[in-house]
Every structure is written in structure tokens, then in C-alpha cells.
């Protein structure tokens, strides 16, 4: 029998004397010992091997006095886990840029295989209309992947790819990366799995940008993070030339307020709503080839699930972890591919 698994599910087996008394044996997920998030809430992760999860085949048997009972054993299967839209990075499309050097110029994103409005895209990339190297497709093995590489057009822009959309504001020469997509979770994942290949370098004197405390000798790390959210709207992060002017006129604090950065590992929930779970992975050294990566999800709430129609999934990849601060090395490269949930 195929069973539906809505979360890290709890099941129970009931038995009783006919007409009298009830006994219940439970099969439930178990959680790692909790730790405290910097915002003050406890966070925890799912233990592998406990509970009932999506995409699994389970064996069961009844045991009495430490001995199996003949004829009371079998298997059951739960429904397959969900796919992440276009997570295999094999299908790419183009949509018109907000600022295009040539009439009709377009830039790429992973998605449907025909031109469409950005509003219909699941993945987006910031500032790609200025320089198309920030996110392009690359041929790797039997399919395609996303290739992220930073560039400077007056200020530094990191190679990036995220679930959401990007809006360009011409009057400010700035843009807003708006993070989050509506995604109907049917099962609670334990982790996000993907593959990556990376080149990382020291930040360098020219790449310091506006990051407080950054040093030229610091490694310009790549970063991938994921969030399960329950947001009323997307969270918007500003980047672009206006920030340089704000810093000169009002100081770094004003720049950061305008930028509105968000880091799920260190920050409290933003104004848009709750972060139910998050996971983060920093790429601190270059790789010699493809690396398999599993990013464990830390749950701030073990019972909640996103409400229908809310912005519920954030995945963000950047060739420079502090690209929001216009900080990074243009030599950094990041290839990403095969995004999928682990249950």
C-alpha cells in the first residue's frame, strides 16, 4: 500500500481487548538535541532512521516476548518526495531584461524552455541584465548546470542564483533581489542535496566593497543556503550604485538599512514572516571537481508548515558570500546542479 507522508510522520498501531481498554504503540520522528539560535529560539534537526518519511519502503513485524509473530510481517511504501522545480538545471529559458544594452536583449534562468515573463519563473538571478556572466548555463557531463561568476560594472556583483525574482530600479541604478517562491510542501525534508564545483580566492584590496570588518586577505567564500518559510511576501535585498552614494553621505549603517540583508543563520525572522527551517553551507576552498553536498535543515518550529499560497521556499547560491555588500573577488566561480530534497 502507498502511504502519504505529510511531514516527518508519526504513525501508531492500536490494539485492545474486545470492548475493553486501549493500547497504542507509536512510530514517530525523533530530533537531535536542540541548540539555541542567535535570535534566542531553540533549533533542532531530524534524526535519520526514526519516523516515517516520503519516498521510503519500510519493513514491519509484530514482536511478542522478543519473538517475531508468524504471519504478522510485511512492507509498506510512502509516496515519493517532491521535486524542486527545474532543480536538475537541464532546462533553461530567457526573459527580457529590465535594462537591455540592445533592443530585445534577454538573459537566462533555469526554467521552462520558452521565453516567458519573469513573474512565471521559479528561479531568478540578480543584475544579470547588466552582465550575463552572473548566471549562465554550462554543459557538464550528460546535462547542464548553472554557472555563477562575479563581475564589476562600477560596483561588484556576485554570481548568483535564487528562487525568486529581481527588479531593476533605473532611477537608483540599483536592483532588488526578492527572495522566495510559493511551494506547497507535502513532506518535511531532512536536508537539501546538490552538487557543486567551485573556485574561491582571497577578497583582495579591490573587492572589499562595503562589508564591515572585511580584510583583503580573507577568503571570499561561496555560499548556498535554504529556508522553509511562511512569508506573506518576498524578502527584498537591495544592491547597486545607490549604496555607494549612501555610504559616502550617511555612513555604513544607513547603507545596511537600505540594503535590508537577511541571514537565516544569525538573524531573527524578518518582517515578512516566520522562518520554519534553514540550512547553510559556506564554500571555503576550491574544489578539483564536483562535490556532493548535503545541507542539513535546522528547524525552529517542529510542528508548523507554511500556509497555502505563502512564500515558502528560499534557495540562494552565490559565488561570493558577501556579494550583498558589493564585496568579492571576480575570479570566484561556482557551478551548481541537481537540487533535491533528502528525507
Label each region the model flagged.
Residues 233-307:
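Extracellular carbohydrate recognition and processing domains
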Residues 65-82:
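Extracellular fibronectin type III
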Residues 63-67, 316-320:
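Beta-strand-rich extracellular modules
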Residues 287-289, 305-308, 320-343:
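Extracellular carbohydrate recognition
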Residues 16-53:
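Recognizes extended acidic, P/S/T-rich segments that occur
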Residues 1-8, 13:
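Single conserved hydrophobic/aromatic residue that forms the stacking wall/gate
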Residues 21, 93-149:
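Extracellular glycan-recognition surfaces and repeat-rich motifs
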Amino acid at each position: 500500500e502507498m502511504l502519504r507522508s505529510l511531514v516527518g510522520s508519526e504513525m501508531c498501531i492500536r490494539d485492545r481487548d474486545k470492548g475493553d481498554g486501549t493500547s497504542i504503540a507509536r512510530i514517530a520522528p525523533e530530533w537531535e538535541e536542540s541548540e539555541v539560535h542567535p535570535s534566542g529560539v531553540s533549533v533542532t534537526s531530524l534524526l535519520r532512521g526514526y519516523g516515517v518519511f516520503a519516498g521510503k519502503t519500510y519493513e514491519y513485524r509484530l514482536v511478542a516476548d522478543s519473538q517475531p509473530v508468524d504471519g504478522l510481517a510485511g512492507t509498506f511504501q510512502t509516496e515519493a518526495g517532491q521535486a524542486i522545480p527545474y532543480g536538475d538545471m537541464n532546462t533553461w529559458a530567457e526573459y527580457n531584461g529590465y535594462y537591455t544594452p540592445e533592443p530585445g536583449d534577454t538573459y537566462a534562468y533555469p526554467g521552462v524552455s520558452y521565453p516567458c515573463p519573469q513573474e512565471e519563473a521559479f528561479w531568478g538571478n540578480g543584475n544579470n541584465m547588466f552582465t550575463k556572466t552572473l548566471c549562465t548555463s554550462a554543459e557538464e557531463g550528460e546535462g547542464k548546470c548553472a554557472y555563477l561568476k562575479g563581475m564589476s560594472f562600477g560596483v561588484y556583483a556576485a554570481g548568483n542564483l535564487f528562487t525568486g525574482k529581481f527588479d531593476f530600479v533605473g532611477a537608483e541604478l540599483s536592483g532588488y533581489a526578492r527572495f522566495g517562491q510559493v511551494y506547497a510542501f507535502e513532506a518535511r525534508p531532512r536536508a537539501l542535496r546538490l552538487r557543486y564545483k567551485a573556485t574561491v580566492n582571497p577578497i583582495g584590496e579591490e573587492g572589499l566593497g562595503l562589508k564591515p570588518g572585511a580584510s583583503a586577505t580573507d577568503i571570499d567564500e561561496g555560499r548556498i543556503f535554504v529556508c522553509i518559510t511562511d512569508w506573506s511576501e518576498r524578502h527584498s535585498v537591495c544592491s547597486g550604485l545607490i549604496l555607494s552614494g549612501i555610504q559616502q553621505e550617511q555612513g555604513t549603517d544607513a547603507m545596511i538599512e537600505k540594503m535590508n540583508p537577511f541571514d537565516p543563520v544569525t538573524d531573527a525572522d524578518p518582517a515578512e514572516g516566520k522562518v520554519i527551517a534553514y540550512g547553510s553551507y559556506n564554500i571555503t576552498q576550491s574544489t578539483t571537481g564536483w562535490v556532493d553536498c548535503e545541507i542539513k535543515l535546522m528547524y525552529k518550529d517542529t510542528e508548523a508548515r507554511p500556509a497555502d499560497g505563502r512564500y515558502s521556499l528560499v534557495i540562494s547560491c552565490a559565488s561570493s558570500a558577501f556579494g550583498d555588500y558589493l564585496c568579492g573577488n571576480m575570479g570566484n566561480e561556482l557551478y551548481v546542479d541537481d537540487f533535491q530534497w533528502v528525507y
